[in-house]
């Protein structure tokens, strides 16, 4: 049996593990039935998504992780449109940045126990620092695999909705949790533009000075915003915040 066959041919025991993960993740029973009707194909795709690159096989999760990224963004956009239609463009971008973030993906991965079902090399398993990344990558690949099996964006949205409801409530209750830089980049890429470019200057040498650093942000050479802060990070955050505000005007 070749390495490729390990992923392409799914044993009965492996199939039970995959179905157990889908059930534990609260995927709707009707969607699981759809998968079972095309079982040979779907199990192969799901097993591919659950095979980490560290396992050193030619077929691994990367292709489906890439697909999952696109599916996740679309599903999150439709979720926000449906649940928060009155949010401004800037606030929508800020919220979506959280709903598709690696942090959120890792959180979902932990909750559904994806790491215990993934094929991962022992060395990677022992690397505690890589655990969040592995869970995030696996969850995103699983999203891509489920879409490839179900071909139904509504099914993906319905599956993720309970997890998004919790995250949305936390983010909207605490605006400071939002990542303005990520939100601005989300907006920029959604418009087909380049990533924002931040330019920072140190205005004073005094520690604790709230305007020690000055930052401007440009998107494709267009000035979008400026901000000051006691650190480079805070100045960037303020510049991105101003840019997002301008999008709503």
From Swiss-Prot:
Disulfide bonds: none
Region (Disordered), start-end ranges: 227-249
GO MF annotation, one: double-stranded RNA binding
Ranges of compositional bias, category Basic and acidic residues: 236-249
Binding site for Mg(2+): 65, 137, 140
Claim: Nuclease is one of the keywords in the record: yes
Catalytic activity reported: Endonucleolytic cleavage to 5'-phosphomonoester
PROSITE patterns: DS_RBD, RNASE_3_2
InterPro entries hit by this protein: dsRBD_dom, RNase_III, RNase_III_dom, RNase_III_sf
First-tier enzyme category under EC: hydrolase
UniProt entry keywords in alphabetical sequence: Cytoplasm, Endonuclease, Hydrolase, Magnesium, Metal-binding, mRNA processing, Nuclease, RNA-binding, rRNA processing, rRNA-binding, tRNA processing
Cofactors, names only: Mg(2+)
Biological processes per GO annotation: mRNA processing; regulation of gene expression; rRNA processing; tRNA processing
Cellular localization per UniProt: Cytoplasm
Enzyme Commission number(s): 3.1.26.3
Cellular component GO terms held in the UniProt record: cytoplasm
Source superkingdom: Bacteria
Subunit structure: Homodimer.
NCBIfam families membership: RNaseIII (TIGR02191)
Name of this chain's protein: Ribonuclease 3
């Amino acid at each position: 049996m070749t390495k490729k066959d390990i992923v392409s041919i799914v044993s009965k025991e492996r199939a039970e593990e995959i179905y157990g993960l889908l059930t534990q993740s609260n995927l709707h029973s009707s969607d699981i039935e759809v998968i079972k009707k095309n079982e040979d194909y779907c199990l192969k795709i799901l097993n591919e998504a659950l095979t980490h690159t560290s396992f050193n096989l030619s077929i691994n999760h990367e292709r489906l992780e890439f697909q999952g990224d696109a599916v996740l963004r679309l599903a999150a956009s439709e979720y926000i449109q449906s649940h928060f239609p009155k949010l401004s463009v800037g606030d929508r971008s800020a919220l979506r940045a959280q709903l598709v973030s690696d942090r959120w993906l890792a959180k979902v991965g932990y909750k559904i126990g994806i790491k215990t079902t993934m094929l991962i090399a022992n060395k990677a398993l022992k690397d505690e620092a890589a655990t969040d990344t592995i869970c995030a990558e696996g969850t995103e690949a699983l999203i891509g695999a489920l879409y490839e099996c179900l071909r139904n964006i509504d099914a993906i949205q319905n599956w993720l909705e309970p997890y998004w409801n919790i995250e949305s409530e936390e983010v909207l209750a605490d605006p400071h949790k939002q990542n303005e830089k990520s939100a601005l980049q989300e907006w920029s890429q959604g418009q087909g533009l380049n990533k924002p470019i931040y330019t920072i200057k140190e205005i004073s040498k005094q520690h604790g000075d709230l305007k020690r650093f000055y930052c401007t942000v440009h998107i494709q050479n267009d000035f979008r915003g400026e901000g000051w802060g006691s650190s480079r990070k805070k100045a960037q955050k303020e510049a991105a915040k101003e840019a997002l505000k301008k999008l709503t005007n």
